[in-house]
Amino acid sequence: MTVFSALEDLPVRIATGGFILSSGLDKLEADKERAAGLHGFASGAYPFLGSVPPERFAKALAVSEVGLGTALLLPFVPSRLAGAGLAAFAGGLLGLYLRTPGMRREGSLRPSEQGIPLAKDVWMLGAGLSLLTADRRRTRRNRRNREG
């Protein structure tokens, strides 16, 4: 792992980090109604969240998004670490998509009209997995270049 992110990782880190940071900052200002909406949606897919008060859930989600977005934007956070966080976050969003009724077409993984906003988050999972494997790919490439 390197101290600073590789230049080739920065575009995906800036795009995803800026998007997630903005989302988190918006949620920091969530009123009771918005907190209840976020909580209701999430606890429908993840029932264990039902025991968490809506305001606490919204605040925790906001702080998590701000932290992840910031980590993605800071070049001294290793890409593998930032990628692991992004992949986990995106996996949670895709879990919402898969578990929430009405998000997918009947008998299909294809999104319904209501599911498109969540289904599109698959790009963040791909970005996270790419960052997670980036250092390993670079190490192999560098080793091959030295050997031959």
For the regions a language model picked out, list residue spans one by one.
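Short amphipathic, positively biased membrane-proximal segments
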Residues: M1-G148
